[in-house]
Amino acid sequence: KIIDELLQFVNERQWWIFSFEWNTFEEKYWLKIKPCFVRFRYLDNNLNSGFLWTKIDDISLIIDDFKNLDIKCNKVFIIENEINYLTFPKIKDSIVIWWKWFNISNLKNIDWLKKLEIYYWWDIDSHWFKILAQCRKYYSQTKSILMDMETYSYYKQYIVKWKIITDREFKNLTDYLDKKEYSLLEYLNKNNLRLEQENIDHEYVGKTSI
């Protein structure tokens, strides 16, 4: 805030800059914005064509470079927790993306993702069902995994309190969640509950993932 005030003072002749509402400090002063990175792993060694004469399993790319890829896979798993990302089981013709950001809109408009099976796994709570709905706006084929009442009930000892989403937000989700997902969302939101995905053990993941 102090730097912002100083820059406004220095640039007082350019008063029109400050008459707009800017999303970020960088946009306001035409500064370079820190790029968004996508981190992903190959779940099938046959997909890894190699980089600099060696095969690299865990890769991070800026979003624009990721958009230009053409990985010959059939399935993509999107996961929020890093440990689960690192320990996710090997699956034929698949990659897994670690997406720790709340804003999943940064993953939209990636042409090669549009033709693939996409599986979404986040915490079982109202917020992440909202993000699932948003993901389906961009990729309607997206399916949720390990975000069902069976998983929730199996790990009931790890259920904790959580914040709710508003009625207005609820109305915007009906077109993007199936009946079971929406029913679980209503239950979670009514009771202010959540189950974090890091509480789900690796053996259970291996048995139930695609």
Language model regions located:
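Nucleic-acid enzyme cleavage-core boundary/entry regions
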Residues: 1-117, 127, 134-137, 141-145, ...
